[in-house]
Amino acid sequence: TPNNPNWEVTDISSASELAHKAGAKLIVDATATPPTMTKSLNLGADISFHSATKYLNGHSDIAAGALSFNQQSSMYENLFTIRKLHGTVLNSQDAFLLIRGLRTLFLRVEKNSQNAMLLAKHFNNHEFIEKVLYPGLETHPNHQIAKHQTNGQFGGMLSVIVKGSQTDAINVV
């Protein structure tokens, strides 16, 4: 949460309650909201996963992912065993590159969020744009949920719907 490209935001706490009442686990794709922005596990998620290739690494020069668990469980034990047996561990160079990216994660996410907000506000009043999809805008239908779940930053990605035809949209790009 939020999903791409519509940037709808799931209320993690409410989804967690529903999942747990049904005896299910809540797994959150937190790739677009790294841990410096949103603490998915604190909001009730059982598992949070990230594409470490994106925000966490910051340079797109590795292929990696990360899973975080709210508590040690049988699912954790099973996945840990699979990891051990299949050798799905980062090599030392990729681990170094990931650590390099993590050192600047807070600053990059902060600046990306600021820049995305500026772009969202600019496009929100643009004559060729029908709609801006960005949870940081107060006009976004899930703005209050996003505001509650984040540290006041809303991420560095947004979508726009261009007025007119597909050709018009291609011309804008």
Where would I find each of the regions flagged by the language model?
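Conserved PLP-enzyme active-site core in the AAT-like
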Residues: T1-F128, L133, T139
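Conserved small-domain helix->loop->beta segment predominantly found in fold-type I
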Residues: M117-V173
